[in-house]
Swiss-Prot record:
Domains as described in the record: Consists of 3 domains; the N-terminus binds the ribosome, the middle domain has PPIase activity, while the C-terminus has intrinsic chaperone activity on its own.
Cellular compartments annotated: Cytoplasm
Gene3D superfamilies, sorted: 3.10.50.40, Trigger factor ribosome-binding domain, Trigger factor, C-terminal domain
Organism of this sequence: Idiomarina loihiensis (strain ATCC BAA-735 / DSM 15497 / L2-TR)
EC number: 5.2.1.8
Protein name: Trigger factor
GO cellular component entries: cytoplasm
C-alpha cells in the first residue's frame, strides 16, 4: 500500500492511497465464491454457478462492495501509518477502480489543530463571596407563601403586589393598533410584564375606575411598527385583588412533606436547598469566567467539520426546546448558531488540552461528590447514588464532568482571582437587581 499526504488548506488533508490490484481482485473473487454463488440464477442449481457466469452477472456489484470495504479499512491504516488525527469523517473518492489495475482513492478530511494553552495568568475571575442569610431564608418562605396564596377582592386602591383585572384599548395618534386591546386582562403589579410606565400608572386605580395612561414603547420593542412610538391606553379596572397569604404553621409546612419539626424544620430544609443552589450558581459563574478567559487569551484554528457538527447539535436542541419534531421541522439557518458553535468547539479543544497536557484523571472523590450533590435533591439520596453507580453511561458522564471541573480548578490556580462580595439575590436573581 502506497500513501501520500497533501495539505490542501488550513487543517484539511488529502490522503492518496494506492492498493495493489491483487488485493482487491482477491476480495472480488472471495465475494463471488462465498456469497454470490448462492444466488438463484435461472438454468443453474443453487451453489453451482460457474465462475465466469458469476463474474458476468455480479462482477460489477462485487467489485463495488470490495472497493468500498477496502477503501474504508485502508483509510484507517493510512491515517495510523502517517500519524494523522482526523477531526471528522473523511470524504472518500475512488480514482482508479478497474479489474487488473491498482485501486487508487483519495480521502479528504480535517485534522485536529495543534493546541497550546497559554496566558492562564491573564485569565481574570471575580469569585462571588456570598452566603445564605436569615433574611434570604425568610424571603424564600414568603415566596412559598405567595405561591400558595389565595386572591381576595378588595375595595381599596391598588398597590404593588395586588392583581388588577382590567380591559384596555391602546391607540397611537388616535388610531387603535394590533395587539393593543384586551379584555379581562389580569396584571400583578410589580412583576414588570408590561412596557415601562404602564404598571406605575395602574397603581392607585380602583375597581370601576377608567383611566387614560400615556406610555412610550421602547426602541428595542419586538414589534417593528411600535418601536419608540408614544401610545395612549384607556384602562377600565374591573377588579382589584390582594394576596391572602397562608399562615406559617404545621398545616403549611405539611405541604412540603415536612412531617416533624414544624416551621423550623422547613426553614432548615429551605436553607439547605438554597445553599446547594447557591453553590452551583457560584460554580457556574466562575466556570463561565474561566472559559471566557481562556478563549480570549488563546488562538486556535477550528476544524470546519467540528463546527458543522456542533451547529447540528445546537439546531436539534433548539427544535426540541420549541417542542418540535427535529425531523419534521425545517432546517434553521446555520448562521443562527455559528458563533455559539465556534465558541463551544474552541472551549472543548482548549479544555481538552488542559486535561491532556497536564495528565488529569477523573478523581474518585470528585466523582463521588458530584453524585452526592445530585442525589441530595431527592427524597432517597442513597437510591439515586446506587442508580448512578449501576449505570455505566451515567458514570461516564459524571467522570467527564469531574474532569471538566478539575480542568477549571487547574486554570483557577494559575488565574488572577478576586473575591467580590455579593448577595443571594445578586447571584440567583440578577435580572431583578
Amino acid at each position: 500500500m502506497q500513501v501520500s499526504v497533501e495539505t490542501t488548506q488550513g487543517l484539511e488533508r488529502r490522503v492518496t492511497v494506492t492498493v495493489p490490484a491483487d488485493t482487491i481482485d482477491s476480495e472480488v473473487k472471495r465475494l463471488l465464491k462465498e456469497e454470490y454463488r448462492h444466488r438463484r440464477v435461472n438454468g443453474f442449481r443453487k451453489g453451482k454457478i460457474p465462475p465466469n457466469v458469476l463474474q458476468k452477472l455480479f462482477g460489477r456489484e462485487a467489485r463495488s462492495r470490495a472497493a468500498s470495504s477496502i477503501m474504508q479499512s485502508k483509510y484507517f491504516e493510512a491515517v495510523m501509518q502517517e500519524k494523522l488525527n482526523p477531526a471528522g469523517a473523511p470524504a472518500i473518492e475512488p480514482k482508479v477502480n478497474e479489474p487488473g489495475k491498482d485501486l487508487e482513492f483519495t480521502a479528504t478530511f480535517e485534522v485536529y489543530p495543534e493546541v497550546e494553552v497559554q496566558n492562564l495568568d491573564k485569565v481574570k475571575v471575580e469569585k462571588p463571596a456570598v452566603e445564605v442569610t436569615e433574611k434570604d431564608v425568610d424571603n424564600m418562605l414568603e415566596t412559598l407563601q405567595k405561591q400558595h396564596a389565595d386572591w381576595k377582592e378588595v375595595k381599596r386602591k391598588s398597590k404593588k403586589g395586588d392583581r388588577v383585572t382590567m380591559d384596555f384599548v391602546g391607540s397611537i395618534d388616535g388610531e387603535e393598533f394590533e395587539g393593543g386591546k384586551a379584555d379581562d386582562f389580569a396584571l400583578e403589579l410589580g412583576e414588570g410584564r408590561m412596557i415601562p410606565g404602564f404598571e406605575d400608572q395602574i397603581k392607585g386605580i380602583k375597581a370601576g375606575e377608567e383611566k387614560t395612561i400615556e406610555v412610550t414603547f421602547p426602541e428595542d420593542y419586538h414589534a417593528e411598527n411600535l418601536k419608540g412610538k408614544e401610545a395612549q391606553f384607556v384602562v377600565t379596572a374591573k377588579k382589584v385583588e390582594a394576596r391572602d397569604l397562608p399562615e406559617l404553621n404545621d398545616e403549611f409546612v405539611a405541604l412540603f412533606g415536612v412531617k416533624e419539626g414544624g416551621v423550623e424544620a422547613l426553614k432548615e430544609e429551605v436553607r439547605k436547598n438554597m445553599e446547594r443552589e447557591l453553590k452551583n450558581a457560584v460554580k457556574a459563574k466562575v466556570k463561565e469566567q474561566v472559559l471566557k478567559g481562556i478563549v480570549e487569551n488563546n488562538d486556535v484554528e477550528l476544524p470546519k467539520s467540528m463546527i458543522d457538527q456542533e451547529i447540528d447539535q445546537l439546531r436539534k436542541q433548539a427544535a426540541q426546546r420549541f417542542g418540535g419534531n427535529v425531523e419534521q421541522m425545517p432546517d434553521l439557518p446555520a448562521e443562527l448558531f455559528e458563533e455559539q458553535a465556534k465558541e463551544r468547539v474552541k472551549v472543548g479543544l482548549l479544555l481538552g488540552e488542559v486535561i491532556r497536557g497536564n495528565e488529569l484523571k477523573a478523581d474518585d472523590e470528585k466523582v463521588d461528590e458530584i453524585i452526592a450533590t445530585a442525589a441530595s435533591a431527592y427524597e432517597d439520596p442513597q437510591e439515586v447514588v446506587e442508580y448512578y453507580k449501576s449505570n455505566n453511561d451515567m458514570m461516564q458522564q459524571v467522570r467527564n464532568l469531574a474532569l471538566e471541573e478539575q480542568a477549571i480548578e487547574f486554570v483557577l490556580e494559575k488565574a488572577s482571582v478576586k473575591d467580590k462580595k455579593a448577595s443571594f439575590d445578586d447571584i440567583m436573581n440578577p435580572k431583578q437587581q
